[in-house]
Structures are given as structure tokens and as C-alpha cells.
């Protein structure tokens, strides 16, 4: 379904700007509820990724990727040890986007050993967002290389792993990429963990 040009965010017709109303049908409501309840369904039905061989293609999850998503959704803490080019990072990006779209008032942080790595993941999330139908997008208030703010008051930030990366923030979901290569990992962890520990929803949120 084509997206109205005048409803896009700052000239990007594929990202819905804030303040755009949606005409809800019974089918849209049912589909929205289904996506809310099942991240794997939302990802495999609506998200697209860039393939080196085929360009933009639907994100068809392998069994192990579905298992990853289930673990993310069912457990507060997750550690993933996997080989390179196994599709783990793109799976994380897809899960984070689902979490942001269907969970209002949440703050998500992507931290990596290099700021460029974290921003690259945010860029992948933006590409996925651009292919989501408008009725599933909450509307975007701000979008740049380092963060996205949605109309449902959820937001995501990308930064390097330093002790002050997310200081002062209350983070509902934190993703640490390339953590094996983080220098001074212990002071970083002790400086970052309270941002999760003192988040009001953290104790109840299995995805944090």
C-alpha cells in the first residue's frame, strides 16, 4: 500500500511523522494486536532487510533466530555467544524495533565498543522502520544518526560504551554489542547497571 507523501517525516515518505491520524478498520486492529503479542510474526510479516545478493528482501527468520527472540522476550538478562555473520545483530535490531513500536514510554539504548558500530545498528533499524506500514508506526518526532524519538514517547539512542554513555537515563532495555571488546568492562558495567536497576519497570520487564 503506497504511503501518503504529506504524512512522511521531513521528506521521508516512508517514516510517519507525528500527528498523523489513522483510520482504523477491524482488520487493522486485529493485525495490530497480533503484532503486539508476537514479535516473530511482526518481524517475518512486515520487516525487510538488505541482502548483499538480492537487495531489500523480507526478513524470513531461521529457527535459531526465532529462538533468540523468544529468549529476549522471556528473560530479563540474555548473553549471546555466536559466530560472526550469523544474523544475530540484525535479529536484535528487529526485536528492538518491535519493542519500540508496541511498548510506549520506553527507553532503549544500543551501546557498542565503537560509536560507529552502535550507529550502524540504529541505521539498520531505520531501514526496517521505513518498510513498516503506517498503521503500525506510532509516528516519529525526531530521527537522526544517534537516536529516534517516537510519538508513543518511546525512544532509542546509540552510543559508545563509556561509563557516562547513559548516565542519568532510566533505560528499560539495554543492548550491548561486541561486549568482549569493551575496554575497562568492569567500571563500565558498574556505572551502567544502576540505569537499569533503578528503572521502575525493570523488575517487571523480561526484555531488559
Sequence positions of predicted segments:
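Phosphate/NTP-binding elements of NTP-utilizing enzymes
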Residues: 2-200, 208
Amino acid at each position: 500500500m503506497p504511503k501518503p507523501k504529506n504524512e512522511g517525516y521531513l521528506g521521508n515518505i516512508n517514516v510517519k511523522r507525528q500527528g498523523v491520524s489513522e483510520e482504523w478498520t477491524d482488520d487493522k486492529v486485529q493485525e495490530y494486536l497480533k503484532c503486539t503479542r508476537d514479535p516473530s510474526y511482526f518481524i517475518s510479516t512486515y520487516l525487510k532487510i538488505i541482502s548483499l545478493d538480492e537487495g531489500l528482501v523480507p526478513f524470513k527468520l531461521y529457527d535459531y533466530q526465532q529462538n533468540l527472540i523468544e529468549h529476549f522476550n522471556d528473560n530479563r538478562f540474555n548473553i549471546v555467544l555466536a559466530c560472526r555473520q550469523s544474523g544475530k545483530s540484525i535479529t536484535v535490531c528487529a526485536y528492538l524495533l518491535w519493542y519500540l513500536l508496541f511498548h510506549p514510554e520506553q527507553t532503549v539504548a544500543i551501546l557498542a565498543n565503537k560509536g560507529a558500530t552502535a550507529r550502524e545498528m540504529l541505521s539498520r533499524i531505520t531501514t526496517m522502520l521505513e518498510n513498516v506500514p503506517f498503521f503500525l508506526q506510532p509516528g516519529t518526532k525526531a530521527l537522526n544518526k544517534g537516536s529516534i524519538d517516537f510519538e508513543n514517547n518511546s525512544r532509542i539512542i546509540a552510543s559508545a560504551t563509556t561509563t557516562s554513555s547513559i548516565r542519568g537515563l532510566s533505560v528499560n532495555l539495554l543492548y550491548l554489542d561486541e561486549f568482549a571488546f569493551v575496554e575497562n568492562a568492569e567500571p563500565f558495567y558498574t556505572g551502567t547497571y544502576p540505569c537499569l536497576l533503578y528503572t521502575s519497570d525493570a523488575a517487571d520487564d523480561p526484555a531488559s
